[in-house]
Amino acid sequence: MTQHHPTQSPQFFLTAPSPCPYLEGQFERKVFTHLVGPKASELNDLLTQGGFRRSQNIAYRPACETCRACVSVRILAQQFKPSKNMQRVLKLNSDLIGTAHRAEPSTEQYSLFRTYLDARHRRGGMSDMTVLDYAMMVEDSHVDTKVIEYRRRGPDSFITGKGEGELIAVALTDQMADGLSMVYSFYNPDMQERSLGTFMILDHIRRATAAGLPHVYLGYWVNGSRKMAYKVRFTPQEHLGPNGWERVE
């Protein structure tokens, strides 16, 4: 009788072509593998450093036949200096505090998530996500994932590290050996004047710096894509190219 032993090496798969969400007229393909088992965090670190992104228990990266427009971006947190506009954003949101929780969904989170999608990404690929879909996005992780909730500071926040009142913004974040990876973030769309998306990235840079971690991973940047243009404002950063990670000022 032949015995079958589980393989220690990850198995990779290739998706069928589908319309690219970033470049009109292009088609995308992805290579992916499953992040499960006791080595999931170690594998996720290695793959993220190689340009992969995590979605639930899947790690993926673009594998398009004729296009290399998607570029992995990571901020050099220890060397980062905020611009004057970013300093203004930090000051504007100094009344907020982010609290890291276990990766557990809540109805309050989903309500904000739904409001954000309906206002900002009504026709996007996530627009029809149900509360169960959201729960899977948060919970289905075999790596060190946190939900960071942002609320207004209260009189005891300096002691408790927690905010009070309504939930204003949320970041789903992976803790890695060499940095923080921002998996997904959303916020109250009625507070545009706060630039909450920028603020959450700045807060993650602060968290990485305080923890002695060198990087904040932002995922992919596509030159010419307006929805991704914000990612290259946080310098210095590194872009993953054919010769590895290359510094960009």
From Swiss-Prot:
InterPro entries assigned:
Acyl_CoA_acyltransferase, Asp_Glu_LeuTrfase, N-end_Aminoacyl_Trfase, N-end_Aminoacyl_Trfase_C, N-end_Aminoacyl_Trfase_N
Q: What is this protein called?
A: Aspartate/glutamate leucyltransferase
UniProt feature coiled coil, ranges: none
Catalysis performed (reactions):
N-terminal L-glutamyl-[protein] + L-leucyl-tRNA(Leu) = N-terminal L-leucyl-L-glutamyl-[protein] + tRNA(Leu) + H(+); N-terminal L-aspartyl-[protein] + L-leucyl-tRNA(Leu) = N-terminal L-leucyl-L-aspartyl-[protein] + tRNA(Leu) + H(+)
What gene does this protein come from?
A: bpt
Question: Where, subcellularly, is it found?
Answer: Cytoplasm
Q: Which domain of life is it from?
A: Bacteria
What the protein does? Answer: Functions in the N-end rule pathway of protein degradation where it conjugates Leu from its aminoacyl-tRNA to the N-termini of proteins containing an N-terminal aspartate or glutamate.
- What molecular functions are annotated in GO for this chain? arginyl-tRNA--protein transferase activity; leucyl-tRNA--protein transferase activity
The record's section on HAMAP family has: Bpt
Keywords noted in UniProt: Acyltransferase, Cytoplasm, Transferase
Give the family per the record: Belongs to the R-transferase family. Bpt subfamily.
Q: Which source organism does the UniProt entry give?
A: Chelativorans sp. (strain BNC1)
Annotated EC:
2.3.2.29
Q: What class of enzyme is it?
A: transferase
Name the GO terms of the biological process aspect: ubiquitin-dependent protein catabolic process via the N-end rule pathway
